[in-house]
């Protein structure tokens, strides 16, 4: 009779060849039943931005085989691989159109950054212009994941307008990716994100963007440039609260349009509580989802789907050169990363694309969630310590342009609003760089008119008992994709 040790060895040999087996200890033998009996299959769900794919594997060897290809990205079913390849992925770039250093900002000559790029490029940049940034390596990851979220939202609009599935040939995405090329002429370029961040949030070139700043820049850039099918943008960085009156106002204005909804949330202190895992899956399964940006401390990723308890993401930290002819092709990849829900950072930016005609469906979808809430009004959620006389008209002026410099009193992603509560002036010299150190907070943004001007005043992240909430603004834009 074979020993248990021998049987174990033979089992491992058979499993290595991915065969289904029976152990027959009575007859002292191991026999394959692959030809004689139907092998029992187990189906696993793979979700990619609202699209669901079922993958069948043998019960006995399936987990090993499935985890192997999710570990090595090898032997992935072609249908799933095509779905991943079709999504847009924006990464660090080098040798792009120079961005001038701010007098009060960091220096482009950073040894840590220089070590992470091509040595020839580093030397060339030093000799050509020491006062300009030629790469966003080390500081641009949140901008890049914001671009990925926005780019895939635009791709969703295009596929819907043309009545096509979400997955199509990469040639169809060129008119979208051209909007993200690294030059000032491209509507959603890194250069324009940096310009917007400098004007409205006092973020200098070379400084890291937070989720709130990224969301704010996306909204302003949608306003400033032709929207290519996205007519309005609603953002909140205080919570996942969406107010009906704001959305309904946008729908009344653009009944056949699309609204990009960006929600900054924090689902825990150091990690995402397990009770939220299912809701994150539900959101990614929704046809409204355009992904999640963030999810790692000071190292943003773009999450586009999941498998079991593993999130799938694109990593923006893989740098590419900006001066290439096949730019569109470089925005697609088969390489993706995996992250367990237990390792996910709780601060993240959720993205949803809402066709105005599907507002009722979206509300029904959010009724399944506790993370995202559609609420009737916002008066009861205003901080009682904030006198209503201090808050002007919360409707943003549609004439606002990037060329203007409003009295934005934000710095980085957090500011102290104590001075605003007690008077009409604030000291913006005291910088709050404690984004990662804050363990308990109610992240906050308020956009309003100043007391004497029509320019917007933006305040982010306050530690309050009950948060005031974001208000939204939109301007008309032409339809870019013909029906």
UniProtKB/Swiss-Prot annotation:
A GO MF term: cysteine-type endopeptidase activity
InterPro entries linked: Papain-like_cys_pep_sf, Peptidase_C54, Peptidase_C54_cat
Record bears the keyword Hydrolase: yes
Catalysed reaction equations from the record: [protein]-C-terminal L-amino acid-glycyl-phosphatidylethanolamide + H2O = [protein]-C-terminal L-amino acid-glycine + a 1,2-diacyl-sn-glycero-3-phosphoethanolamine
Assigned GO CC terms: cytosol; mitochondrion; nucleus; phagophore assembly site
Keywords, ordered alphabetically: Autophagy, Cytoplasm, Hydrolase, Nucleus, Protease, Protein transport, Thiol protease, Transport
Annotated active site: 141 (nucleophile), 315, 317
Keyword Cell inner membrane: no
Domain of life where this protein originates: Eukaryota
GO biological process: aggrephagy; autophagosome assembly; cytoplasm to vacuole targeting by the Cvt pathway; mitophagy; piecemeal microautophagy of the nucleus; protein processing; protein targeting to membrane
TM annotation in the entry: none
Entry's localization field: Cytoplasm; Nucleus; Preautophagosomal structure
Main location: cytoplasm
Enzyme Commission number(s) of this protein: 3.4.22.-
Function: Cysteine protease that plays a key role in cytoplasm to vacuole transport (Cvt) and autophagy by mediating both proteolytic activation and delipidation of ATG8. Required for selective autophagic degradation of the nucleus (nucleophagy) as well as for mitophagy which contributes to regulate mitochondrial quantity and quality by eliminating the mitochondria to a basal level to fulfill cellular energy requirements and preventing excess ROS production. The protease activity is required for proteolytic activation of ATG8: cleaves the C-terminal amino acid of ATG8 to reveal a C-terminal glycine.
Record family assignment: Belongs to the peptidase C54 family.
UniProt-recorded name of the protein: Probable cysteine protease ATG4
Protein's organism: Candida glabrata (strain ATCC 2001 / BCRC 20586 / JCM 3761 / NBRC 0622 / NRRL Y-65 / CBS 138)
